[in-house]
Amino acid sequence: MIVSLRCCLLLVALLITVETAIMSKRDIVCSVSGDVACNLECELLHKKKGSCDENGACTCFNKKRETE
């Protein structure tokens, strides 16, 4: 009983860790590699341009982005 409870808790902790890593993946891209990696990821996955915003998150946008 105790062993199965430990396994269950370990599995839940692992799932939470993996989910957190997936949810924050874009933030990791910007903090580690910057705009170049963000732009490459957006180009490959979404056929769009990308850049890191002021919050450090990778943001994808259409290639014909207007600059102000």
Swiss-Prot record:
Which cysteines pair up through disulfides? They are C30-C52, C38-C58, C42-C60
Q: Which UniProt keywords apply?
A: Antibiotic, Antimicrobial, Defensin, Disulfide bond, Secreted, Signal
Q: In which tissues is it expressed?
A: Expressed by the venom gland.
Where does the record place it? Secreted
One GO term of the biological process aspect = defense response to bacterium
Q: Which residues form the signal peptide?
A: 1-20
Provide one Gene Ontology cellular component: extracellular region
**Does Protein transport appear among the keywords?**
no
Q: What does this protein do?
A: Antibacterial peptide mostly active against Gram-positive bacteria.
Q: Which family does it belong to?
A: Belongs to the invertebrate defensin family.
What other facts are recorded? This toxin has also been classified in the scoloptoxin-02 family.
- Name of the molecule in the record: U-scoloptoxin(02)-Er1a
Q: Which organism is it from?
A: Ethmostigmus rubripes (Giant centipede)
